Every structure is written in structure tokens, then in C-alpha cells.
Design a protein with these regions (language model features):
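Bacterial N-terminal signal peptides
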Residues: 14-27
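N-terminal secretory signal peptides that target proteins for export/translocation
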Residues: 1-11
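Residue-level hotspots at or immediately adjacent to binding/recognition sites across diverse folds
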Residues: 29-365
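General helical structural elements
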Residues: 11-16, 361
Length: 365
């Protein structure tokens, strides 16, 4: 009778345990580390390449060495667009000096341009996919008689943000508008603009002989919000913003006067709905910075200490070193992640078989 009762109850025990085991396994499955395919972006006939930005089509932009010209020992760096395994030089930029730091889905790029042979007078510029240059202008000239400006980001609407003569700006439909910092802040800089028109950046103010920097968020109408700092930190910078209004950047502990500032420690942060939280770093490297985020809340950046540097991903409350998420023995040391798109692709820079190169990481299915 005893054996018979046991046989009759076994199916019930199994039926109860299976859903329990399945439920318990879900958090573990959800925390499985992502994996990536890594692609070397190559160069334009030279040796080195530096990626700066990425759009949702998988286009990467930056600067790459061309073949050596004449008797000079150095290569010439040219703006490039990489897509689908092919890198091409952006035409129309040979007559001047240019660099790009952001690209939107239409292939419009922003950065700075100078026709000065000595590269002394850079101006904020928008570059079309075919290389057409449009200067965005700047605020009143400096004491040197010209205006210095640089565009830092462009959104899907073609709006650009940046800095001119230490003042943040928004460029939209051919007009340049100042993004003023809060009262008490003397200078500002905009680093990122979302597709909704919000901008993130920083403002600087004097506190005695020191300068304090705070992350800023500018709403669509121009209203500015000081995001503050985390407890124990003195400064912060808003480096990226997404369409949900989340801001990523870093906080720091800074000492010294305005003439000589030393930052002792950095930590990446994510700000959302009035709350800033530190994202931490990896165990062997204490300092971290966040450079970009997408609308899914995935954040990328890097950790660094002295000569050690590693590209990072923050996702679902965890931090990952990207070097651990690519195939082993790939020959790569991924040092910095600078952009992430809606597909989860990541671009940045590192060392590949001893050569400095840009990379593209594509999530494995």
C-alpha cells in the first residue's frame, strides 16, 4: 500500500516542480550576458582609424588614415563613412580640414570644419552625405576677431547642438539659438540632442577660486534643469540623452583652482525622472564614463585607470566589459565605446593586433 501511494503521488510532485523550476530559471535566463560579432572598420589606405558615431542604419563615421602623400612622414586623415563592410572617404572635404562626431539616419553629419591650413579657425559645420559643407555660424567673435564653434550632435530632424565661444547652442532650420545655463553659471556646452529636441550637456560656474561643472538638461522650449551631482562628488557632465529623457554621463571628484583642475575619480551615471544613480565600473578599474545610450536604456562608455582602459556596456542593472563579450583570441582590446544604436550595435575604438582601429559590435541572435 505504501509503495502504491508513492507511485500515485509522483506525477503530482513532478507537475508541481516543473513550473517552479521554470519560474526560478527566468531571472538567470534574463541575465545571460549578451554576445557580439566584432568587425574591424579598416582604413582608407593608411594604418589607423578612429570611429566617432553610429546611426540606426549601421553607418559608422569618423576619421581614417589615407596613404602617405609626398615626402611627409605622416598620413592624412580623412572623414569616412563605413557601411556594410565598406569604408569610403567623404568627398568634397579635400580642400579643408574637417572632423565629424555625430551622424543621423539621413546620413547628415556634424562636427567642425576649417579651411585654414594651420587648422586654427574651426567652425561648427553640417556635412551632407556627399560632402557638402554648411557652416552653422557662431556667437559674437572672441578677442582674436573670429568665432570658435563646434557641433557635437545631430538628431533625426536635422537639429544640431554644440558650443560657440563657451556657450551651448541649438541649430534648427537654419537658425542658431543660445541654450542658456541656469543663473550663476557662466559658460555652457551641449553634447547631445534627442529626436524629441531635448539637449544634454554641462554648465560651469565659479565657486571662489574653483570652477564647478554640473550636468544640464535643456527642454524643447529652452528651459534648463541642473541635474546636480551624486553624494560625495563635486562635478558632473551630461554626455548623452535619449528620446525618453534619460541622460547618461559621469560625475567626478575635482580638486584645484580654475587654472589647474585635477579630477581624482570618475563614475558613470544615468539620470531619469529627477533621480541620478551611479552605474559603477568593473572590479579592476575604478573609474568609468558613460558616452552614449539608446532608447532601450542601454548605456556604453569605458573604464580607465592609468594605462588600463576597457569599453563597457551597462544593461539591466549590470555592467559588462565588452572584451569579455566578443570571441576569444580575436586580437582585439576594445578600449572605448562611443555610440550605440536602436539595434544594439556599438561602435568605438581599440587596438587590433597592435594597431589602433575603429570597431563595430553587432549582437549575436
Amino acid at each position: 500500500m505504501l509503495n502504491g501511494n508513492l507511485r500515485g503521488k509522483r506525477p503530482r510532485v513532478v507537475a508541481f516542480c516543473l513550473p517552479l523550476l521554470y519560474a526560478l530559471s527566468q531571472p538567470l535566463l534574463a541575465q545571460t550576458a549578451p554576445r557580439y560579432v566584432v568587425t574591424d572598420l579598416g582604413s582608407l589606405g593608411g594604418i589607423e582609424c578612429a570611429a566617432t558615431a553610429l546611426n540606426d542604419k549601421g553607418q559608422v563615421v569618423g576619421g581614417a588614415d589615407t596613404a602617405k602623400h609626398g615626402k611627409g612622414p605622416e598620413n592624412i586623415t580623412n572623414v569616412f563613412v563605413w557601411q556594410g563592410g565598406r569604408m569610403r572617404a567623404v568627398p568634397g572635404l579635400d580642400g579643408g580640414h574637417a572632423y565629424v562626431v555625430s551622424v543621423n539616419g539621413a546620413g547628415q553629419m556634424v562636427g567642425a570644419y576649417s579651411a585654414d591650413p594651420l587648422k586654427a579657425k574651426f567652425a561648427a559645420a553640417l556635412f551632407g552625405p556627399t560632402g557638402k559643407v554648411k557652416l552653422l555660424g557662431g556667437f559674437p567673435a572672441t578677442q582674436h576677431g573670429y568665432s570658435l564653434s563646434q557641433a557635437q550632435a545631430i538628431n533625426a530632424k536635422g537639429q544640431a547642438v554644440g558650443v560657440s565661444n563657451n556657450q551651448a547652442f541649438l541649430w534648427s532650420q537654419g537658425r542658431l539659438r543660445k541654450l542658456a545655463p541656469p543663473p550663476g553659471f557662466q559658460t555652457s556646452q551641449a553634447w547631445s540632442v534627442s529626436d524629441t529636441g531635448q539637449a544634454a550637456g554641462k554648465g560651469d560656474r565659479s565657486v571662489g577660486s574653483a570652477v564647478r561643472t554640473h550636468a544640464m538638461l535643456w527642454a524643447v522650449g529652452g528651459k534648463v534643469l541642473d541635474l546636480g551631482v551624486l553624494p560625495g562628488y563635486t562635478d558632473s557632465i551630461g554626455r548623452a540623452i535619449n528620446s525618453k529623457g534619460q541622460v547618461a554621463g559621469w560625475v567626478g571628484v575635482t580638486r584645484g583652482t580654475s587654472g589647474r583642475r585635477i579630477t581624482l575619480h570618475y563614475q558613470a551615471f544615468l539620470w531619469q525622472n529627477g533621480h541620478m544613480r551611479g552605474l559603477g565600473s568593473i572590479p579592476r578599474i575604478p573609474d568609468s564614463k558613460a558616452s552614449a545610450l539608446n532608447d532601450k536604456g542601454q548605456v556604453v562608455g569605458n573604464a580607465y585607470f592609468k594605462t588600463d582602459e576597457a569599453a563597457l556596456l551597462w544593461q539591466n542593472g549590470r555592467v559588462y566589459e565588452l572584451n569579455a563579450l566578443v570571441p576569444p583570441h580575436s586580437g582585439w582590446k576594445l578600449q572605448n565605446a562611443l555610440a550605440i544604436n536602436s539595434r544594439g550595435q556599438i561602435t568605438g575604438n581599440g587596438i587590433h593586433n597592435g594597431i589602433r582601429r575603429g570597431f563595430l559590435l553587432t549582437p549575436r541572435p
